Swiss-Prot record:
Organism: Saccharolobus solfataricus (strain ATCC 35092 / DSM 1617 / JCM 11322 / P2) (Sulfolobus solfataricus)
Name of the protein this chain belongs to: Glutamate-1-semialdehyde 2,1-aminomutase
NCBIfam families associated with the record: hemL, PRK00062.1
Domain of life per record: Archaea
Keywords: Cytoplasm, Isomerase, Porphyrin biosynthesis, Pyridoxal phosphate
Length: 418
């Protein structure tokens, strides 16, 4: 069956035809992928795309890297779920702790959503406070406390504050704009906020960077008012550096949430932080967390194998240079008003606007022009996120020949749009 036929079936089986809403943003219907290798994905329709979505971030080595695949196959021969601890969870935790400065102890879960949900509960349990402070357009997963002025597909489908989130929960969530320290200072003064949670680099409203001293200011304010600081590094962890955004900016939170890359493309999440805080999780403490698939062997071995490759440094050299080259070429080629926010191997283009420093700015960008840009690139065999409010990623598989091919296609598309 081709993609159109599969889409017709999917609409009869799933709400909106998909199991995660951003997938429906590709028009007139999503294409269905049957395999991926390196920088490419291949559809059931026989089409080949250069992939800059990369599973929305986890695939920093590209699709199906041999070094990771081999270890997964070996583990499958031994078994994939036991309901007991395994040595693999110790090995992956040690690797994470060796690179993430704030990670004294770790609790593995199964997704970024689970990680932020557990981290918020942990912060409340530790501080004995009920409120949290988050930032407009920061996306921390699909649970109630996160779906208040959320980014990602929540913005794309105009449900930044989701139906079904009780008003009682909304009242426990304070909101500030990203990069606004004065707002944070005012909100924290009542000393009733358990935690300030943020993406240190916003990756779900496009890419939005922290301004100078913003992260430092948050660290100082949370210390002053006895609130915990949570960095949601589900996207940035092991991406903008092997030590994440906290190493890149040298600002260290009390709690870090991780996901995506640490599972090598398999479901995973983690809550990491100071031992005295993490030890409040059951069975050591009274903050409950559990999961049938927590620290499952397949996710553990995929994460170990991925980090082992990242420790060789070459993936960062290739992926970062690929992004840098693409950004430079886009700046050279684009004649329309725009801005590009970029760090490491992640970037996003905002059309019709000179600066994007927060969620309000991102929403003023020309979304319709971005959609045209996406659609024209898709016709040329280049897959970037279908939503303005996502991130363009590069990987270790995006080598010089792939980038040269992409630039040729960009020249054609931008020439037509200009």
């Amino acid at each position: 069956m081709n993609s159109e036929e599969l889409w017709a079936q999917a609409k009869q089986l799933f709400a909106g035809g998909v199991n995660s809403p951003v997938r429906a943003a590709v028009k007139p219907f999503p294409f269905y992928v049957e395999r991926g290798k390196g920088a490419y994905i291949y559809t059931v329709d026989g089409k080949k795309f250069i992939d800059y979505v990369l599973g929305y971030g986890p695939l920093i080595l590209g699709h199906s890297p041999e070094s990771v695949k081999r270890r997964i196959v070996e583990q499958l021969e031994r078994g994939w779920l036991f309901g007991t601890p395994s040595e693999l969870e110790i090995e992956l935790a040690r690797k994470i702790r060796s690179h993430i400065p704030s990670a004294q102890k770790i609790r593995f879960v199964n997704s970024g959503t689970e990680a932020t949900m557990a981290a918020i509960r942990l912060a409340r349990g530790y501080t004995k406070r009920s409120k949290i402070l988050k930032f407009s357009g920061n996306y921390h997963g699909a649970h109630d406390y996160a779906l208040v002025e959320a980014g990602s597909a929540a913005t794309e489908y105009n449900v930044a504050t989701s139906d079904g989130v009780p008003m009682e929960i909304m009242k426990t969530v304070e909101i500030c704009e990203f990069n606004d320290l004065d707002c944070v200072d005012k909100k924290l003064r009542n000393e009733d906020i358990a935690t300030v949670i943020l993406e240190p680099v916003m990756g779900n409203a496009g890419v939005i960077l922290p301004e100078k001293d913003f992260l430092f200011g948050l660290r100082e304010l949370t210390k002053t008012y006895n609130s915990l600081l949570i960095f949601d590094e589900v996207i940035t962890g092991f991406r903008i550096s092997i030590g994440g955004a906290q190493s890149y900016y040298q600002i260290y939170p009390d709690i870090t949430t991780l996901g995506k890359i640490i599972g090598g493309g398999f479901p995973i999440g983690a809550v990491a932080g100071k031992a005295e805080i993490i030890d409040n999780f059951t069975p050591a403490g009274k903050v409950f967390n559990a999961g049938t698939f927590n620290a499952n062997p397949i996710s553990m071995i995929a994460g170990i194998a991925t980090i082992e490759e990242l420790e060789k440094e070459y993936p960062y050299i290739i992926a970062n240079q690929a992004a840098k080259t693409l950004v430079e070429e886009l700046e050279r080629l684009l004649k329309t008003k725009h801005t590009i926010n970029h760090v490491g191997s992640m970037f996003q283009i905002f059309f019709g606007i000179d600066e994007v420093r927060n969620y309000s700015d991102a929403k003023r960008a020309d979304k319709e022009y971005y959609i045209k840009f996406h659609e024209r690139l898709l016709k040329e065999g280049v897959f970037i996120p279908p939503s303005q409010y996502e991130t363009i990623f590069t990987s270790a598989a995006h080598k010089d020949d792939v980038i040269a091919d992409t630039i040729d296609k960009l020249m054609k598309v931008i020439g037509e749009l200009n």
